[in-house]
Amino acid sequence: MDRMKKIKRQLSMTLRGGRGIDKTNGVPEQIGLDESGGGGGSDLGEAPTRVAPGELRSIRGPLSSAPEIVHEDMKMGSDGESDQASATSSDEVQSPVRVRMRNHPPRKISTEDINKRLSLPADIRLPEGYLEKLTLNSPIFDKPLSRRLRRVSLSEIGFGKLETYIKLDKLGEGTYATVYKGKSKLTDNLVALKEIRLEHEEGAPCTAIREVSLLKDLKHANIVTLHDIIHTEKSLTLVFEYLDKDLKQYLDDCGNVINMHNVKLFLFQLLRGLAYCHRQKVLHRDLKPQNLLINERGELKLADFGLARAKSIPTKTYSNEVVTLWYRPPDILLGSTDYSTQIDMWGVGCIFYEMATGRPLFPGSTVEEQLHFIFRILGTPTEDTWPGILSNEEFRTYNYPKYRAEALLSHAPRLDSDGADLLTKLLQFEGRNRISAEDAMKHPFFLSLGERIHKLPDTTSIFALKEVQLQKEANIRSTSMPDSGRPAFRVVDTEF
């Protein structure tokens, strides 16, 4: 009888603690048990079913994945052992312990979990049954998400599929691409679909590849958002956020007279988006009003990165056939291929002037005429104003008249002295002398916007500040209504 009690005690300890039976206590390593549970009259001499201590543990499974075991009615005896295993307990053989398995329900996954995990917009509508499917298979949320798993998850939601988007209106067409106004079935929001035709011999145009590679890494409130990329055998479709119009259309709608407070807001946002690009070592290289998009709230965003480049060093040789002629700096017009972020700053100055006056500053139709317009207002450069210019072969070939510089205020009377000073700092002959986007944002011209506007996170709009509001235009006419008779949005200049 004592032997039976020892066996019962050891078995109880094994089930309670998950430990093997001590081989040094005189009990055999393998314990014989009657299949019926071991009644008081069991015959220990019969051939037993043998269970090794390790097998007892394997029944429970690994500790990390074992269901929680709740012991019931575990009354303790005076010797610190449970009554079931105590030497003072009844001689009747009973089940050593009674256990109740507690199975935790699967973690319930919410739409917010999905949005945060996959960086999705807050208003996305997930496919029917998608949350329930993930709830049944939730380990995805307990470990890092691999690139492959992320792609699979996005595809299951509907990203990367043409059928997710509805084409509404055709907005424009270029050599390689057509732009449509569309609607997303995932969010019910309007989108711009830039459909790039893939030539069988050439594949995707390098400008499209460049735009995709840069935009997917640029996350800023003043840079157009690339929502999705759809690749088929015949086309590459880029899905952009939809904005109501571009700056050129905004100027037209205002009768080419923009409220000067709004000019300041637009210019600040242009500089803010550009400063972010330059910090990321990206040059836009094609700034013009048609590539600056504006929504009804007044948010301005940089678009069309088809000519943009990532730069690795301050100056590098690139093609000089960039930037629409009116916004092209004189050093590039004269053949320079060594430039950096300063190439964008000249274009900012031209756009600033155009917003303030309603007309382009240098509307040349040829390179020679463009330089003539520049020199007539800013003065023909000399060795004093532009060291080394006289050794430039193209400059000597044109043989321009000796113009004297004119005061910019005489051409842009709506600018105050701070505005004229900022414009002068942007329109410098030499790229190295042009003010940077980061420094331009700190110019006194923007003091009236307050200090908080400089402390916003990159992805936060300036209109998140209650003190920043777009003012109503005096002569604005709406062209964003469906019956206006012309497209209200131009996502990019698609002439690659």
Curated annotation (Swiss-Prot):
* Main location (coarse class): cytoplasm
The residues that the entry says bind ATP are: L171, G172, E173, G174, T175, Y176, A177, T178, V179, K194
Q: Name one GO cellular component term.
A: synaptic vesicle
* UniProt function note: Protein kinase that plays a role in vesicle-mediated transport processes and exocytosis. Can phosphorylate CCNY at 'Ser-336' (in vitro) Plays a role in the regulation of insulin secretion in response to changes in blood glucose levels. Regulates GH1 release by brain neurons. Required for normal spermatogenesis. Regulates neuron differentiation and dendrite development. Phosphorylates NSF, and thereby regulates NSF oligomerization.
EC no. given is: 2.7.11.22
The UniProt similarity line reads: Belongs to the protein kinase superfamily. CMGC Ser/Thr protein kinase family. CDC2/CDKX subfamily.
MF terms per GO, please? ATP binding; cyclin-dependent protein serine/threonine kinase activity; protein serine kinase activity; protein serine/threonine kinase activity
Q: What is this protein called?
A: Cyclin-dependent kinase 16
Question: SMART domains given for it?
Answer: S_TKc
Where does this one sit in the cell? Cytoplasm; Cytoplasmic vesicle, Secretory vesicle; Cell membrane; Synapse, Synaptosome
Give all Phosphoserine modified positions: 12, 36, 65, 78, 82, 89, 95, 110, 119, 138, 146, 153, 155, 391, 478, 480
Query: How does the record describe its quaternary structure?
Result: Found in a complex containing CABLES1, CDK17 and TDRD7. Interacts with BRSK2. Identified in a complex with NSF, syntaxin-1, synaptotagmin, SYN1, SYP and CDK5R1. Interacts with YWHAH, YWHAQ and YWHAZ. Interacts with CCNY; this interaction increases the CDK16 kinase activity. Interacts with CCNYL1; this interaction mutually increases the stability of CDK16 and CCNYL1 and increases the kinase activity of CDK16. Interacts with NSF.
Entry annotated with the keyword Chloroplast: no
Instruction: List every stretch annotated Disordered.
Output: 1-95
